């Protein structure tokens, strides 16, 4: 019971966001550079392929459908700063350069998982 209370305390005081960043294939490393520069090391890069018809892609100003999808765990208090840096570095103000958004993490099962995501592996469990 005490361990469950500890997890609830940690989760309620240290909010995390899952940042999704979708960019053209090959641009994922530039996104990872931003996270690394901010000492955010819990990142996963996946490869994706869009399925929208080419006529829709042309209207949206999107070209190639091969994408890098980067998933990153960020302290909620740092999310806006990180999104701004990614947007600036990859020029998201231009159509077809990418998108980034956050999803708040409400809970994580397991204290070690939470500590891994928050890069706090210094305490004994």
Predicted feature residues:
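Positively charged, small/polar-rich N-terminal and surface patches that mediate targeting and assembly
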Residues: 1-125
